[in-house]
Amino acid sequence: MKGKFIVIEGIDGCGKTTQIDELSKWLPISGLLKKESKLITTREPGGSLLGKKLRRLILDNNENNKPSSLAELLLYSADRAEHVSKIILPALNNNDWVISDRFSDSTLAYQGYGRNINLEIIKNIESIVCQGASPDLTFFLEISPEESIFRRKNEIPDRIESEGIRFLERVNEGFKLIAKQKNWKVISASQNIKTISNQIKETLLNNFSNAK
């Protein structure tokens, strides 16, 4: 893989989408990309055509359509397998940069720590579906579960967002553990948008300025 793979993680409401929008404007003029390289921004679930259909199934808030925890895990895994095959690997092999709103560690946090599915089972599945794709750098935008709920109070929640605060606390603790284990760049998402954006940009410059 020749391109760069950047992932932004965090619980809902932490500002991932906002920061990816900022990066999509800045990175092409940052001097970090090679002349022939493009920037691909994507997300999970829903980064591929099949993924968009899976996203609707996964996040459907109709109680009658609620999947079991294991079925939910496998739906996310199917989404990721397609995402890696059709979007991420082709872009990286083409020397492009990929920025993804979530990747495999979200599954560890939500389905592992949140749903209490055995972590080794998840890791074994992920080792297959990721097909060797691994982030060059992961940012963790950290906010408290209470702040997450407050920020989303006027939104119509999807099925995952409708889970209670205890679930969100488990997910958040999972993210913190993973961030420490994998040496992620942790940024307080309670700061203003510009401050967070500047910290992300500075980290990218420090890590990749000599990688062209």
Curated annotation (Swiss-Prot):
Keywords: ATP-binding, Kinase, Nucleotide biosynthesis, Nucleotide-binding, Transferase. Its EC number is 2.7.4.9. Pfam families: Thymidylate_kin. It catalyses: dTMP + ATP = dTDP + ADP. The keyword Transferase applies. GO terms for cellular component: cytosol. Coiled coil: none annotated. GO terms for biological process: dTDP biosynthetic process; dTTP biosynthetic process; dUDP biosynthetic process. One of its GO terms (molecular function) is dTMP kinase activity. InterPro entries: P-loop_NTPase, Thymidylate_kin-like_dom, Thymidylate_kin_CS, Thymidylate_kinase. ATP binds at G10, I11, D12, G13, C14, G15, K16, T17. Belongs to the thymidylate kinase family. Phosphorylation of dTMP to form dTDP in both de novo and salvage pathways of dTTP synthesis. HAMAP family: Thymidylate_kinase. This is Thymidylate kinase.
